[in-house]
Amino acid sequence: MAHYFVGDIQGCFAELQKLLAKVDFNPSRDELWAVGDLVARGPDSLATLRFFRSLGDSAKTVLGNHDLHLMALHGKLKRAKPSDNLTEILESPDISASIDWLRQQPLMRELPEHQLIMSHAGVPPQWSLEVLREEAALVSCALKQDDYLEALISQMYSDSAEQWDPSAIGIERLRYCINALTRMRYLYVDGRLDFDCKQPPENCTNPQLKPWFEFASPLRQSHTLVFGHWAALMGNVGDSKLKALDTGCCWGEHLTLWHLEKDQKITQKKLKKS
């Protein structure tokens, strides 16, 4: 059995299939773990989502910001932009089933036997494993409720929840968790989330900002952290226990697959349009 972890697919289904062929992926024996953002921007979000649904227990994904955005669009809480490239999936006959499937996916997953944690954007350095589990579970619980659109999705878009406050309750607590696990890149020196800078660290001009993974963290010491979201890193973080897998396929770069057992990365360049 092999565990394969794939970066942000974002509808780049053909590239995903090329990658899986390279490693002879077999869902009857292997598992495919995705760091989230299965959909948006790329040409084939519908096929990507249907493929993951078809894999059953052989597929493990976490929610990314674009997956949550799809829920908001389906619930008519936001207007789609042309760059979302989600018209086909929103008009598909199985869109409700796809949304229901996404609602069952968590914000973080663990592989305890390998001391590994996967989330879309990373893990706040202030959080212990226990806090991470608790906060992610609160969001998962809210997503599974009948009123998830009104109680959570309609209120999740806010930059106000930028600082971790263990005494926060209700939507503010859920917002911080969503912001941290699906949107985080840089933190201010006081631990606040920054939502603006997307550049790689060498190009960041604000001395008050540091990448989240450069802060001291108990989980950074004890676990391998697998994440995506930050395409500008191009997988370069300089730490063998950090696996940054978003390598910008939807922007014309490549899709990255990491074979856990071999600690090997396999890449597939963005395919040219035929």
Curated annotation (Swiss-Prot):
InterPro entries: Ap4A_hydrolase, ApaH, Calcineurin-like_PHP_ApaH, Metallo-depent_PP-like
E.C. no: 3.6.1.41
Pfam families: Metallophos
Organism superkingdom: Bacteria
GO biological process: RNA decapping
GO molecular function, one term: bis(5'-nucleosyl)-tetraphosphatase (symmetrical) activity
Record keyword Repeat present: no
Protein's name according to its UniProt entry: Bis(5'-nucleosyl)-tetraphosphatase, symmetrical
Alphabetical UniProt keywords: Hydrolase
Cited CDD domains: MPP_ApaH
Family: Belongs to the Ap4A hydrolase family.
Gene3D superfamilies: 3.60.21.10
CC per GO annotation: cytoplasm
Catalytic activity entry: P(1),P(4)-bis(5'-adenosyl) tetraphosphate + H2O = 2 ADP + 2 H(+)
Enzyme class, broadest EC rank: hydrolase
Organism: Shewanella baltica (strain OS195)
